[in-house]
């Protein structure tokens, strides 16, 4: 049986949300776990930009943006009225893709992602946009600038965290605090979750003591979900 091919990288947040959508829609695919240092030739042929996820359908159609893959999954599930294996109703996911939800995901994928990258890798940035790793001999100054940079971008990232916390308080966009997936699961949850997970992992002690209790509970619920665990199994690296 021929299956769609998904080129993926286990720890990539974009690939995570694509895998979650595929699993939720009960769409079987052949997962090809790539090496970032030696990307498969076929993947580069069908998607020269060289980033994951890349979904190659049986008819040769290529979908190489994670949000587009999520939307395609929803269309497939709706057309065949798939019986879902995992928590939630796909109708709830589909119903909540309105303008506000899309705007929330857009902020995640632009401003928040930039702050996340700088927070995770402060050595690549400084207060003035200078790469810190160009000053390897200035150890004390390097450490000081690195910490200042990390705190700066964490603070900027917190603007989005605070907004999500407020949404969880008010149940806006079904980004709810009930954690009942049948009622609260939506497009934004899956699209945003992998990035909040990464932000929290930079300094888990700080996050666990931060002033975002609703967001923290929401994150823990997703991390512990059978859906997430099912897409985080380790696959051998594809060679080809």
Question: How should these model regions be labeled?
Answer:
Residues 1-151:
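GST-like domain detector, emphasizing the conserved glutathione-binding G-site
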Residues 39-42, 169, 227:
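Glycine-rich, flexible loop/turn motifs
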Residues 104, 108-220:
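GST-like fold's C-terminal all-alpha helical module
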Residues 210-240:
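Long hydrophobic alpha-helical segments typical of transmembrane helices together
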